[in-house]
Structure formats: C-alpha cells, structure tokens
Amino acid sequence: MRSSCVLLTALVALAAYYVYIPLPGSVSDPWKLMLLDATFRGAQQVSNLIHYLGLSHHLLALNFIIVSFGKKSAWSSAQVKVTDTDFDGVEVRVFEGPPKPEEPLKRSVVYIHGGGWALASAKIRYYDELCTAMAEELNAVIVSIEYRLVPKVYFPEQIHDVVRATKYFLKPEVLQKYMVDPGRICISGDSAGGSLAAALGQQFTQDASLKNKLKLQALIYPVLQALDFNTPSYQQNVNTPILPRYVMVKYWVDYFKGNYDFVQAMIVNNHTSLDVEEAAALRARLNWTSLLPASFTKNYKPVVQTTGNARIVQELPQLLDARSAPLIADQAVLQLLPKTYILTCEHDVLRDDGIMYAKRLETAGVEVTLDHFEDGFHGCMIFTSRPTNFSVGIRTRNSYIKWLDQNL
C-alpha cells in the first residue's frame, strides 16, 4: 500500500512537472492553457517519434491525431444547413443560415482555417462550430475551404486551392444557387488561414475581373512575414503556447519544403542579415521600430545581423514572395484592398505581424479596425466549447462576429 502511494505521488509530480510552464499573469485561464499546451506537446512528441521510426511524416501523424479526435460530419440543424461539396475540385463545407423573407439574398464569408498550412481541417469540431455560429448569427452563407496541406503539397499550392475555390464561388450562377448578395462577401481566416486570406485579397486586386469583388477582409492573428523572427512579440512570447517561436519557424520551413538545418539560423535572423542583398529592399516594409506603437516596442531592440547565411534566401526565395508574406507587398497593392479587420493577441508571437499590417494598410488609405486582446493567446478564438472553452475565446469570437454583422 505504501509503495503504491509513493508511486502515485511520483506520477502526479511528474505529470505536474510536464504540464506546468510559466505563463504571464494576464493570459486567459492559465491552468487550462497549460493543460491544452501539454496535450498538444504530447501529440507532437508522439508524431515526432513516429517520424523518427520511419513510419510516417510527423505532420501527417500529428494531423491524424488532431482530425481523429475532432472530426465532425456535416450535420444540419433547424437553423443552419451544412453540406460538403467541392468548388472546382477543391473540397468545401458550406453553412447556410436561416432564410429571411425580408432579405432574399444573404451575405457571405469565405473562411480559411489555420494550422500552419499543415494541420487541422474545415471539418473538425472547432471550425465547424465557428462557422455554424457565423451562419446562424449573421444569417449568412459561410464557405469553409478544405485546402490541401503540407506535406502533400507545398507553397504556393495552398494559395492556388483557396483562390480556385473562391473564384468558383463568385461565379454569378453559384452565388445565385446559394442566394448570396454579390456585393456583401468577405474573405477571412485565422493564423495560416489569415495568411492565405490576405494573399488572396492582394491577388484579387491585381485581377481586373475580380477587383472589388470582396467587400471586406477579416484576418485573425494572421501569419504575415518570415523575414524577422525577432519582433517584440517574437521576443516576448518566444516560448508561449500554443505557438512558440521555434515551432512557427519550423512551419515556415515545412511550407517551403526547406531544410530543418536552416531553422536555428532563421531564428536569429541570419537569413535577412545586412549582407543578404535580396532582402535589403524589403526591410523598410516591416521595420517595427516605425510601424509599432511604443506600447508594444517597450525596451526590445531590433536583431539585425551584419553577416549571415545568404544561402537560405537563395534556396528558399519564397521567403521574399508577397504571396507567402503579405506584409511585404507593394503599397500600390495595399491601397486597393477592402475595409479590413485584424484581430491580434498579446501573448502571441504573431501579434506584431497583424499590428504592422494594420499600420501599412492605414498608411495606404485602407479603413482598418485593429482589435487587440490583452489576455489573448494564439488560436484562442476557436476554443469556445467544453472542455477547451476559454473566456477570451468566447470574447474574441463575439467581437469578430459583431464586426462582421456591423460591416458586411
């Protein structure tokens, strides 16, 4: 009996040691976030072991775990009709809100899920619940795109998928089928999905047949650049769940089918050092010392290497492509974008990407709403139902839907 108690105590202590990580006091529901982070770290470690044993790619294994525990079939309710179909060969899940006699045509949001271009699905519970809520509360048609993921495809195929599906949806006959008002359409996405949404928005401004087709864009803690991994938010949140800096840099390398040997050099900005001529012209477009308010720069210092590794940009020229990094787009492109909503979270390495993009858009003459949550963390908006419900998740979702309701 005594030995059992000792063993149990030891196991509890080990579990507590694994789960506990120091978190800022201002983050929402810290103990719940620790448990969520421990669960995700555990799944990552299992998938890394599977990869090491040569059984499967670690991202395929990790996504199998995520989707297996969270996949939801297309289930319709009295309020929202849900169907799985495809738009020009790209899988989508469509959510149709309840009809209103006084409004025969509905507004619509094309939504792109996050997951580092490699994980999650439009068909998992978190995104299904988000899109269902949007369809019901906005009385809208929500098109959630199931784009192909790394490692099955790499940049720019994810962008091609979302552009192809959205172009198909914008056809007059398709909009008529779903009873959508062609003047009330928004493109939106979170995290990597926010990156894809921003890239799509920019691409549409450069296509005469698609210009002015989108009324709004709404970007939720978007990934917008890979040239500076030492912005104040990257420095402040270097180990903050659920997206530590090291993990984000690896997602970028995976997106470009790059070499993991580059990760450590990229973390210290060796890929954009002063001797890397290819990056020189783009530095001003993400100069956070001028783009961020003093309340965010605090006492952080820029990390600019004099000499670095030019080979990284030479082997991964995608780093300098505005389709992967919308923050570095030309001002002439930005000024053509529609009214924009950007949601950022204090405890997120990507915080400054969103804030800098908001500033560049404002400078270009675009109307921007920057919605910042002091207790938010990366990914929080999809965590709104038990057991992974967070106070800030509910508040961010409500704020996002409220903005759509008022502007779409």
UniProtKB/Swiss-Prot annotation:
Residue intervals on the Lumenal side: 26-408
Record keyword Cell membrane present: yes
Topological region Cytoplasmic: 1-4
Signal peptide: none
Catalytic activity: a 1-O-alkyl-2-acetyl-sn-glycerol + H2O = a 1-O-alkyl-sn-glycerol + acetate + H(+); 1-O-hexadecyl-2-acetyl-sn-glycerol + H2O = 1-O-hexadecyl-sn-glycerol + acetate + H(+); a cholesterol ester + H2O = cholesterol + a fatty acid + H(+); cholesteryl (9Z-octadecenoate) + H2O = cholesterol + (9Z)-octadecenoate + H(+)
Membrane topology: Single-pass type II membrane protein
Catalytic residue list: 191, 348, 378
Transmembrane segments: 5-25
EC number: 3.1.1.-, 3.1.1.71
Keyword terms of this UniProt record: Cell membrane, Endoplasmic reticulum, Glycoprotein, Hydrolase, Lipid degradation, Lipid metabolism, Membrane, Microsome, Signal-anchor, Transmembrane, Transmembrane helix
InterPro entries: AB_hydrolase_3, AB_hydrolase_fold, Arylacetamide_deacetylase, GDXG_lipolytic_enzyme, Lipase_GDXG_put_SER_AS
GO molecular function: acetylalkylglycerol acetylhydrolase activity
Enzyme class: hydrolase
The keyword Transmembrane belongs to this UniProt entry's keyword annotation: yes
Annotated Gene Ontology cellular component terms: endoplasmic reticulum; plasma membrane
Principal location listed in the UniProt entry: membrane
Pfam families, per the entry: Abhydrolase_3 (PF07859)
Post-translational modification: N-glycosylated.
GO biological process: ether lipid metabolic process; lipid catabolic process
Biological function: Hydrolyzes 2-acetyl monoalkylglycerol ether (1-O-alkyl-2-acetyl-sn-glycerol), the penultimate precursor of the pathway for de novo synthesis of platelet-activating factor. May be responsible for the hydrolysis of cholesterol esters (such as cholesteryl (9Z-octadecenoate)) in macrophages. Also involved in organ detoxification by hydrolyzing exogenous organophosphorus compounds.
Family: Belongs to the 'GDXG' lipolytic enzyme family.
Protein name: Neutral cholesterol ester hydrolase 1
Lineage, opening ranks: Eukaryota, Metazoa, Chordata, Craniata, Vertebrata
